[in-house]
Structure formats: structure tokens, C-alpha cells
């Protein structure tokens, strides 16, 4: 254990700065970055993986800022809700989830049906249709006599007219299980709102609870009619499946309703509709008295009368908590666009600052899109951080530069190059100030973005990439090894001479080449 403790130890997160071998359409590789070039040539450096299972996401899925900062601060792989549920299905524990079993049993005892609703999509952003199939299987295995699916169609995280293919595949899965019927279909536009457009949510409610929609014999027939009317999946008008003119699967008293979206933001409103004791946005005609309402994950702490199949997992002994336990002080600094990431997400989803934790917020510029001002507020952020650390002796400083990600999202190559050059300049200023104070710096990123500005079809690439992030150490003689984002916190603890808690299963990536002097 190294006994030397640099002060301040500084973690700089370059949001959206990925490493990509190809220079073509790579704003990072083609920008003038004398400081980063020098460090990558002459200082200890390595790469950390930022996507897929390495950050708790499914294989091949790009990382994002929220996931990246969770892993950076936790010092362990933080499995996201999608992956938690998928892993539970793979290992069989999903079929024994007590919340699901109790909800199914409650419907059985009341003589009711089990209803599943959610985004029927393989997109993996809000839900996954394979997880809905698993829930059908669970309901069947536990004695549900009637199982109905209320399918919300995607078209945003999937191609705009792909629902026919996915519905066909889903119904083939139902046939193999010998259980479950699609009772209603509508585009996500009508139910998955998050901006209090209650007229849309009401149409989704009335479809499921009252059977108010255009009647069709099958889900695929409803989708084909929508395509014939030039509707895309997201905007498919509410449709109800009927037999002899009557809806086959309205939600009635005694039934159980299970929402199968793992992402919370777009099912909060519809969940409040079905469960709130008092509700003002619209009159809930025919509100069913449910045996149970299950949220796959936690959607909203204010929801009443709900059960949560996969509640949040509390993270203990994360980096910020370890600092507090040792009586050390910290500063978290970012401009508005990434402030929540270096605070809330870096702290494992905790809103309040920890003991000894100060925060510094610099306003992001008020422009329509950041290609109009690619420098953003990087210079002011650097000024404020230098001023703060020169007046207050912090032990740990965490700084996020938002430019590579926020300008990368615009898809404007020239602006992204300017953003990268701005960050390199400000990095030089910040690191000079820290080193002059006797501090050390660890530089990394949460995911890639500006490293690819044009896609394979020649159009603007505005999404994150799967590429690794740099890891650069400005300090003592040492070597760095490749790893993943969850290894950064253990590396910081090693650099600070602090023990790593058992809960952190990441590993330190630093190896000192000579003993430190206390």
C-alpha cells in the first residue's frame, strides 16, 4: 500500500472522449490536442472499456453518461435494470420472483386474469419483448387461467415500421408457450408520455380498461391497417382485439396488472392512472379494482398501492463514502449538462452530498444546440475549479468536461473538433495548477462519442460509440493496465494510499515502478 497521498488527487472525466483507431470522421484524432498527445506518448496510460457487460449492460450495447458515472463512482460493475432482469431470466430466478408470484396468486384467488403491458420491442431501451414472454411463462407456470398482453409499439428505438416483424415473432413465442393472447395494440405515443400530456395517456387507459379502440381480429391485422394508413409504429392508433364483436381482454376487477418496462420515465404517468387513490388529470371511467399492480422496477417513489419486482439495489462503500469514512474532503465540479452525473450518479443514485463533499456548478450556455458554442463553459469551469482548489485544500476533486459528448451529439464534425481542442487547452491549464500544488491527475472518459462523427452510410453519427476510453496518470513513476470503468475507483484509492472496501470488486490498474516517499 502506497503511503504517499497527493493533494488534491483529481479525476478528470472527458465525457464522450473515445479511442478509435481510424482517423476518418474522428473529431478527436483530427483535432489539435498537444497536451493529450504528449501524455499519451510520455505518461502512464491505458484503456478502459465502457460498454456492454463491462458496465452492466447487455453485450454490444453502448454505454452512456449515467451508466458510466455509476460504474466510475461505485468501483464495481453496476448491473442496469435490463441486465438484472435478463440475468434473472437466464439463471431461472425470475420464475421464482416473490413479487410476481404473489401478484399472480392474488389474481388466481380472485378469479381474475393476469395482464402484462409494456413496450413490445427488442430495442432494449425501455423494455424487451423476450422479458414479456418470460412473464407470460411465469404466469402460466403459476396457474394463471387467462393471460393478456397489452402491446405498446415502438418505432423510436427500433425502425419506424418494424412492429409487424416483432409482433409475429412474439406471437410465435406465445404459441410455443401455449399461453397468452394479445388483447390491445397501440403506439407508444398514446401511453408512454412523460410530459403530462394526459389526453394521450387517457387514450391508453381507456383502451386497456374499457376496450375503446378500433376493433380487429388480430394484432397483426391492426398493424397492417395502420401501415396501410401510413402510420408508423409509434403512432399506431389504439386497437382492440375482439371475438364476436367483444373485446377479448379488458382489465376488470380482481385482475392483476404487471408493467414490463424496466425504464421508469415513460410509465410513471400510466402507473399513477391505475393506482392513485385520488387522481385529477382526467376522470377514470371504469377504473378496475386490481388484485395487484406490479412495476418491474421502481418507477416513482410516490406511487401508491404497487409492488416492485426488482427494487433498486443500494450501493455501499462507493468512492464518495470511502472518502467520508476517512475524514477526507472532496469537490465535484461540472457544468449544468453533466452536473447530475458527477453528483447523483457518481454517488450511486444519492441526491444529497456526502459528508465533506462540496459541489461546484457552472451554467451551460443557453444555445439551441451546442455546435453553436462548442467551447460551452469549459473555460469558466476550469477557472472556477482552479480558484476553488487554491483556496480550499481538497483531498479528491472530480471534474467533468461535457464538450466531447454534448457537441458530438449534434453530429457537426467541425464543431466537435473545436470542442476537443477546447477541452485539451483547459486540461492543460487545470493539470498545471494541480501539479504545481503537489497534486496528481487521473484522466478518463465515461464513453465514446466524438470519436465517430459519420456513420457507415455517410450520415451524421450522433450516438455514443462502443470504443474504450483513455486512462492517463499524471503523477509518480508507474504503469497502468487496461481494465474497465469499475476499476477507476480502486485505482484512485491505490493512488491515495487508501484500502479498497470488499464491496468494490474492481481492481487497481496502477503498478508503481518505485516505492513512494511518505
From Swiss-Prot:
Transmembrane segments: none annotated. Pathway: Carbohydrate degradation; glycolysis; pyruvate from D-glyceraldehyde 3-phosphate: step 3/5. Its cofactor is Mn(2+). One of its GO terms (molecular function) is phosphoglycerate mutase activity. Mn(2+) 2 binds at residues 15, 65, 446-447. It holds the Pfam family iPGM_N. Its EC number is 5.4.2.12. Keywords: Glycolysis, Isomerase, Manganese, Metal-binding. Belongs to the BPG-independent phosphoglycerate mutase family. Monomer. This is 2,3-bisphosphoglycerate-independent phosphoglycerate mutase. The gene is gpmI.
Amino acid at each position: 500500500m502506497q503511503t504517499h497521498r497527493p493533494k488534491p488527487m483529481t479525476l478528470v472525466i472527458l465525457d464522450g472522449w473515445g479511442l478509435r483507431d481510424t482517423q476518418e470522421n474522428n473529431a478527436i484524432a483530427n483535432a489539435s490536442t498537444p497536451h493529450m498527445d504528449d501524455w499519451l506518448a510520455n505518461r502512464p496510460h491505458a484503456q478502459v472499456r465502457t460498454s456492454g457487460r463491462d458496465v452492466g449492460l447487455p453485450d454490444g450495447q453502448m454505454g452512456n453518461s449515467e451508466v458510466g458515472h455509476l460504474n466510475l463512482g461505485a468501483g464495481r460493475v453496476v448491473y442496469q435494470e435490463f441486465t438484472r432482469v435478463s440475468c434473472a431470466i437466464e439463471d431461472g430466478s425470475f420464475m421464482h420472483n416473490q413479487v410476481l408470484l404473489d401478484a399472480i396468486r392474488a389474481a388466481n384467488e380472485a378469479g381474475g386474469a393476469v395482464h402484462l403491458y409494456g413496450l413490445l420491442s427488442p430495442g432494449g431501451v425501455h423494455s424487451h419483448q423476450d422479458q414479456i414472454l418470460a412473464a407470460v411463462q411465469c404466469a402460466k407456470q403459476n396457474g394463471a387461467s387467462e393471460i393478456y398482453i397489452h402491446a405498446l409499439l415502438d418505432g423510436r428505438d427500433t425502425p419506424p415500421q418494424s412492429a409487424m416483424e416483432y409482433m409475429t415473432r412474439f406471437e410465435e413465442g406465445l404459441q410455443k408457450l401455449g399461453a397468452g393472447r394479445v388483447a390491445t395494440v397501440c403506439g407508444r405515443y398514446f401511453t408512454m408520455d412523460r410530459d403530462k400530456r394526459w389526453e394521450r395517456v387517457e387514450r391508453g387507459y381507456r383502451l386497456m380498461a374499457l376496450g375503446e379502440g378500433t376493433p380487429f381480429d388480430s394484432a397483426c391485422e391492426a398493424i397492417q391497417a395502420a401501415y396501410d394508413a401510413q402510420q408508423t409504429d409509434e403512432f399506431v392508433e389504439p386497437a382492440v382485439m375482439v371475438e364476436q364483436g367483444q373485446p377479448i381482454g379488458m382489465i376488470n376487477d380482481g385482475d392483476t396488472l404487471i408493467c414490463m418496462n424496466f425504464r421508469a420515465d415513460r410509465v410513471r404517468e400510466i402507473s399513477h392512472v391505475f393506482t392513485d387513490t385520488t387522481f385529477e388529470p382526467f376522470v377514470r371511467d371504469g377504473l378496475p379494482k386490481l388484485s395487484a399492480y406490479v412495476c418491474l422496477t421502481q418507477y416513482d417513489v410516490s406511487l401508491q398501492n404497487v409492488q416492485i419486482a426488482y427494487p433498486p439495489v443500494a450501493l455501499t462503500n462507493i468512492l464518495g463514502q470511502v472518502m467520508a469514512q476517512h475524514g477526507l474532503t472532496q469537490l465535484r465540479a461540472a457544468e449544468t449538462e453533466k452536473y447530475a452525473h458527477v453528483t447523483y450518479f457518481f454517488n450511486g443514485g444519492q441526491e444529497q452530498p456526502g459528508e465533506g463533499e462540496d459541489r461546484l456548478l457552472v451554467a451551460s450556455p443557453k444555445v439551441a444546440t451546442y455546435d453553436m458554442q462548442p467551447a460551452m463553459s469549459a473555460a469558466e469551469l476550469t477557472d472556477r475549479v482552479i480558484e476553488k482548489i487554491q483556496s480550499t485544500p481538497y483531498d479528491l476533486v472530480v471534474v467533468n468536461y461535457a464538450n466531447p459528448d454534448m457537441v458530438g451529439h449534434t453530429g457537426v464534425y467541425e464543431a466537435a473538433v473545436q470542442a476537443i481542442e477546447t477541452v485539451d487547452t483547459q486540461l492543460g491549464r487545470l493539470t498545471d495548477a494541480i501539479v504545481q500544488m503537489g497534486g496528481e491527475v487521473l484522466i478518463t472518459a465515461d464513453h465514446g462519442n466524438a470519436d465517430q462523427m459519420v456513420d457507415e452510410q455517410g450520415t451524421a453519427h450522433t450516438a455514443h460509440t462502443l470504443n474504450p476510453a483513455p486512462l492517463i496518470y499524471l503523477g509518480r513513476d508507474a504503469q497502468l493496465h487496461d481494465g474497465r470503468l469499475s476499476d477507476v475507483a480502486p485505482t484512485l484509492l491505490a493512488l491515495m494510499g487508501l484500502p479498497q472496501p470488499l464491496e468494490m470488486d474492481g481492481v487497481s490498474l496502477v503498478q508503481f515502478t518505485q516505492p513512494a516517499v511518505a
